[in-house]
Amino acid sequence: MSRHTVESGLLATGGVRLELDGASAIVVLDRPERRNALSNATFAALAAIPDLLPPEVRVVLIRAEGAMFCAGLDLRLTTPEGVPGERSLLDITAGDDTSVRDWIGGLQNAFAWPRQRSWITVAAVQGAAVGGGFQLALSADIRVVATDARFSMREVALGIIPDLLGTQNLSLLVGYSRALEICATARWVGAEEAMALGLANAVAPPEQLTDRALELCAAVLANPAAAVSAVKELVRGADQRDPATQAAAERSAQVPLLRAMIRGVADRT
């Protein structure tokens, strides 16, 4: 099956492109002229991705056009004029606390799906990933970064906090103390440090980034879908289970997989 682009007005308005190729999907941030900044329309487009993926999709690559992965929130939203056709933050924050929390919840939905579903998500990050861009990269299961990649949680420097699930995802990757230091200082983390901290799974030259990420996707697809899905579920929830509960979950997951493997061996003999 050849790769094709999904036609969607919602995605186009948000500056997002979705490409499908059999068991693979590629989500592309496609507003390089705005440094792939996140507007309300971009969040809406990203939140819609799960409903646009056919059931045969097993891996999802998240990448960006241009020299920068994502500059974070589109700062035009902070001005009275805002982004054309969208509510400004001035208007949004004029509402009551519940309405503002609901708005934030909608943004969080855009970043929740990469880890929550059975598919494996891979983020390919080049250049800067700032604020929401950093948190989008963190939402993926695996990160491949270019040698020029750099990350920063800029929110605290602006007097706000990372609120797109990044505090938890970062803590799970690098631990409490390091996550707090990265967030509280808003400093930059380069590709080499990201690799050392476990933020990045692989580093590649910028011109080889997409190919390296696609190779990783292919390596996932080379293994049986049921086993990959089961192991993601086990690893994803391991930190929330005690050893006995995790052992029980492994036993339950293994039974149907073991039977299927043995049947396959028997069928080949």
Model-derived segments and spans:
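C-terminal alpha-helix plus adjacent terminal tail
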Residues: M1-G22, L53, A186-A191, E207, ...
